[in-house]
């Protein structure tokens, strides 16, 4: 008869080795809570089951989650080829291939229930959703179209800020889009922003924070300058929840934090309340 062996729990090092041997597609680590989870557990909405953080989604997937139908506008608009920086032009081509878009924002007219609205969704796979001249032009055209047609606008923001390769031309888009937003507001029309991770830089400093109703996904990073830049400037370490959606909500900068699976229903309810109709959604 063989003697019984005592069970020994694996050491941290053994666990680390086992994790390293797990196929990449099987597990996903949340960038916010740093917990590992099975990729299939993220579900169709790609949400961390531990902290509700929403992983970054392609623009077209966002559109499918938020609308019943969608008609894209200005699909061919892209950065002018007059830029004389070969490295930048090469980056643009890689971004187009990765995102299947010609620019860092997808714009068009969407429908949800009986409501029609302008929709802009920023694409992080296109140079981190950076704000370039063509990006600003597409968003401006969206607001101008919706002002003419008396439609509300919904913007889903996700950006690293103004596109540095385009210099002042990119920075000018902040004022350009803000003017279009102001004209839309003067016409008495609704503007809803949905801030997602990350919304930073010139996008935060302009149209992302100009919504009449401002929503955000849980744990989204929202700010202007990056954390390291701020640390070096003030010579202090900001708190762990610095620039997170929950902190902005607590300080009055947001109206509501909405989990990704509930965004469509919340948007429909807001359109019902503001555009007229039965509130049975």
UniProtKB/Swiss-Prot annotation:
Boundaries of every CoA carboxyltransferase N-terminal domain copy: 26-281
Binding site for Zn(2+): 30, 33, 48, 51
Classification of source organism: Bacteria, Bacillati, Bacillota, Bacilli, Lactobacillales
Molecular function GO labels: acetyl-CoA carboxylase activity; ATP binding; carboxyl- or carbamoyltransferase activity; zinc ion binding
UniProt EC number: 2.1.3.15
Cofactor stoichiometry and binding remark: Binds 1 zinc ion per subunit.
Enzyme class, broadest EC rank: transferase
Cell location: Cytoplasm
Known role: Component of the acetyl coenzyme A carboxylase (ACC) complex. Biotin carboxylase (BC) catalyzes the carboxylation of biotin on its carrier protein (BCCP) and then the CO(2) group is transferred by the transcarboxylase to acetyl-CoA to form malonyl-CoA.
One BP annotation, GO: malonyl-CoA biosynthetic process
InterPro entries in the cross-refs: AcCoA_carboxyl_beta (IPR034733), Acetyl_CoA_COase_Trfase_b_su (IPR000438), ClpP/crotonase-like_dom_sf (IPR029045), COA_CT_N (IPR011762)
Reactions catalysed: N(6)-carboxybiotinyl-L-lysyl-[protein] + acetyl-CoA = N(6)-biotinyl-L-lysyl-[protein] + malonyl-CoA
Sorted UniProt keywords: ATP-binding, Cytoplasm, Fatty acid biosynthesis, Fatty acid metabolism, Lipid biosynthesis, Lipid metabolism, Metal-binding, Nucleotide-binding, Transferase, Zinc, Zinc-finger
UniProt record similarity statement: Belongs to the AccD/PCCB family.
Source organism, top-level taxon: Bacteria
Protein name: Acetyl-coenzyme A carboxylase carboxyl transferase subunit beta 2
Zinc finger annotations (C4-type) as residue ranges: 30-51
GO cellular component: acetyl-CoA carboxylase complex
Assembly description: Acetyl-CoA carboxylase is a heterohexamer composed of biotin carboxyl carrier protein (AccB), biotin carboxylase (AccC) and two subunits each of ACCase subunit alpha (AccA) and ACCase subunit beta (AccD).
Pathway note: Lipid metabolism; malonyl-CoA biosynthesis; malonyl-CoA from acetyl-CoA: step 1/1
Cofactor dependency: Zn(2+)
Major localisation: cytoplasm
């Amino acid at each position: 008869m063989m003697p019984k062996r005592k069970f020994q729990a694996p050491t941290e090092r053994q666990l680390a080795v086992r994790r390293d041997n797990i196929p990449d597609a099987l597990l996903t680590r949340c960038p916010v809570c740093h917990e590992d989870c099975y990729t299939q557990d993220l579900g169709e909405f790609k949400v961390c089951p531990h902290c509700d953080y929403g992983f970054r989604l392609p623009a077209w997937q966002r559109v499918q989650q938020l609308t019943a139908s969608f008609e894209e506008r200005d699909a061919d608009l892209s950065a002018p080829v007059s830029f004389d920086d070969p490295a930048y032009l090469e980056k643009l081509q890689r971004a187009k291939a990765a995102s299947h878009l010609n620019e860092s924002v997808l714009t068009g007219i969407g429908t949800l229930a009986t409501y029609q609205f302008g929709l802009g969704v920023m694409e992080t796979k296109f140079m981190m959703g950076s704000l370039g001249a063509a990006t600003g032009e597409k968003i401006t055209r969206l607001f101008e179209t919706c002002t003419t047609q008396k439609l509300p606008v919904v913007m889903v923001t996700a950006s690293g800020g103004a596109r540095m390769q385009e210099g002042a031309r990119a920075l000018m888009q902040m004022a350009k889009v803000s003017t279009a937003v102001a004209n839309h507001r003067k016409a008495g029309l609704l503007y809803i922003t949905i801030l997602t991770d990350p919304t930073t830089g010139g996008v935060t400093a302009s149209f992302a924070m100009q919504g009449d109703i401002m929503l955000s996904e849980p744990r989204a990073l929202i700010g202007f300058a990056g954390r390291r830049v701020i640390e070096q400037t003030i010579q202090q370490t900001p708190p762990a929840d610095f620039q997170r959606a929950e902190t902005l909500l607590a300080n009055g900068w947001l109206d509501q934090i909405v989990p990704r699976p509930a965004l469509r229903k919340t948007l429909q309810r807001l359109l019902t309340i503001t555009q007229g109709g039965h509130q049975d959604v």
